[in-house]
Regions:
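Conserved amphipathic alpha-helical segments that form helical-bundle/coiled-coil interaction surfaces
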Residues: 1-48, 64-72, 80-94
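Short secondary-structure boundary micro-motifs
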Residues: 2-4, 54-57
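Hydrophobic protein-protein interaction segments
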Residues: 9, 53-54
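Short helix-capping and inter-helix turn/linker motifs at the boundaries of alpha-helical repeat units
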Residues: 59-61
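C-terminal effector-binding regulatory domain of bacterial HTH transcription factors
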Residues: 78-120
């Protein structure tokens, strides 16, 4: 659980730095707006997923997205960076579905108890 806590801290820092380094007021406002939505923050499900067998794979996918977006930015490939971040944001929806399906660690995300999977 300690490793997941460290990941949450580092992940939040990465996203904050990426946001800050963009130096784009409209982009910063939009990311701040979206991040404030329920279940949409960068690490919204990390702790709730910590006991799942898929947790490691999910984190590796997210980290790979981070590496790819940094590479795209370094190479001035704006469209690629945008596409990668759009895909990265879709992980939140995937993670929400996984959290609803598994219902583990509801104590960490009490609002999940209000949601039902499409199978219910």
């Amino acid at each position: 659980m300690e490793a997941f806590s460290a990941y949450v801290t580092m992940n939040a820092r990465f996203h904050a730095l990426l946001n800050e380094l963009s130096a784009s007021s409209p982009l910063i406002r939009e990311i701040d707006r979206v991040s404030a939505l329920p279940f949409a923050s960068p690490s919204a499900f990390v702790m709730a997923q910590s006991a799942l067998p898929e947790a490691h794979q999910i984190l590796l996918i997210g980290q790979d997205h981070h590496r790819i977006v940094v590479d795209a930015i370094e190479n001035r490939e704006g469209a690629r960076a945008e596409a990668v971040m759009r895909e990265h944001s879709r992980l939140a929806a995937r993670n929400l579905r996984l959290a609803i399906r598994n219902r583990t660690h509801l104590d960490l995300l009490p609002a999940l108890a209000l949601l039902k999977s499409s199978a219910e």
